[in-house]
Regions:
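Short amphipathic recognition helices of helix-turn-helix/homeodomain-type DNA-binding modules
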Residues: 1-18
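Short amphipathic alpha-helical segments
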Residues: 17-29
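PAS-family sensory domains
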Residues: 32, 39-125, 129-135, 142-143, ...
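Short, surface-exposed beta-edge/turn micro-motifs
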Residues: 33-34, 165
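Low-complexity, glycine/alanine/valine/leucine- and proline-rich hydrophobic stretches
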Residues: 133-183
Length: 183
């Protein structure tokens, strides 16, 4: 009846997948010099390659903490490593809003938003009053654990459209220091 009255389907709930198909993990592992990770609709990082782990420390985080928004807004150690933190954080928040539109009533996403409002004054302020930003998914610059600045461009690949899984691959703006393995 609601479809007849409103002429639109109800908002969908996002299913927060926590694993990737084995071939996707293999693809990321093959990107030996490119940090890459897969995130679900809620921006939980659910898979990553070794170089992404070296850069972001995903394997050292509890599953609950392995969320890009939570890492950017509520992890002071990562915040210190992001030279353009304010710009990156606003960009990430704007892109999350786009994903939220896919499942605006999803309880897991709404809980994350409420948690971040408590954990971060910046998140709380920007959530109330969104700022227009340009399109760029991911973090532009980060200091590695030896304080060396790394600058990136990104590409987002849809891994599974129905499961809302996206792979973010980072590409160095300068020539990589490592060599490509022989095949």
């Amino acid at each position: 009846l609601f479809m007849l009255a409103h002429r639109r389907p109800p908002p969908t709930e996002g299913c927060q997948w926590l694993e990737v198909p084995p071939l996707i993990q293999t693809l990321m592992d093959d990107l030996e010099i490119r940090p890459a990770y897969v995130m679900n609709l809620r921006w939980d990082v659910i898979a990553w390659n070794q170089i992404a782990d070296k850069l972001f420390g995903f394997s050292h985080l509890d599953q609950h903490e392995r969320n890009i928004l939570r890492m950017v807004f509520a992890n002071p150690a990562l915040r210190k490593r992001l030279p353009a933190w304010q710009e990156d954080a606003q960009q990430i928040l704007a892109l999350f809003r786009c994903d939220l539109a896919t499942a605006p009533q999803d309880p897991a996403m709404l809980t994350l938003i409420e948690d971040l409002k408590v954990l971060s004054a910046d998140f709380r302020r920007w959530w109330k009053k969104p700022e227009p930003v340009s399109y760029r998914r991911g973090i532009a610059s980060i200091l590695d654990f030896e304080d060396k600045r790394l600058d990136f461009i990104h590409e987002t690949l849809i891994v599974d459209e129905h499961r809302h899984l996206k792979m973010i691959a980072y590409f160095a703006q300068k020539a990589p220091q490592m060599t490509t393995p022989e095949i």
